[in-house]
Amino acid sequence: MPKVKLMIKQLDSNEKSVVELSERCFDELRQVYRLTELAVSYKNSTKSEWSCFGFHVDEVLVGVVEAKQVGSELQLSSLAVAPSFRQKGVARKLIDFVVTQFKHINSVSVWCVEQTGNVAVFKALGFNVVQRFDSDFFILSDGSKAVEVQLKQKVTA
């Protein structure tokens, strides 16, 4: 049986494979919610602050996440894992690797839309809910405000 080659590395978030994987994964979520104009504007204005990392299996991109350090907190955004690679440790390995790429991190923070069911995914990864509120960034498909949830995880040395 041939050995599978795994690799995680920093990428350009505009790279074609990153954009395609993100679009494919987030298309599923667009059945549940969509971004408001405010969210699109914010994402575009802060894009340069984020570093993008990708998880490759045999040179095929199967997971991505964006990260930025704010003080001693590492904030994660746009975590996406190809459907056929979910529940196989890709997100956990990606997050663990990204934490090692920044100095003096005490906690990792991630936001998600409650109605997607992703809160349970992050809880399974060791994150705890710290706040939830009606979002100005996301609207549910029925036109009501989505509930944004912030989850955090302590980082141990």
Q: Over which residues does each language-model region extend?
A:
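Conserved N-terminal entry element of GNAT/NAT acetyltransferase domains
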Residues: 1-16, 153-157
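Conserved GNAT acetyl-CoA-binding A-motif
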Residues: 102-113
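Conserved active-site alpha-helix within GNAT-family acetyltransferase domains
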Residues: 92, 115-132, 140-141
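Acetyl-CoA-dependent GNAT
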Residues: 10-78, 82, 95-97
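Terminal substrate-recognition subdomain of acyl/acetyltransferases
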Residues: 110-111, 139-157
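Conserved acetyl-CoA-binding loop-helix of GNAT-fold acetyltransferases
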Residues: 81, 87-100, 124
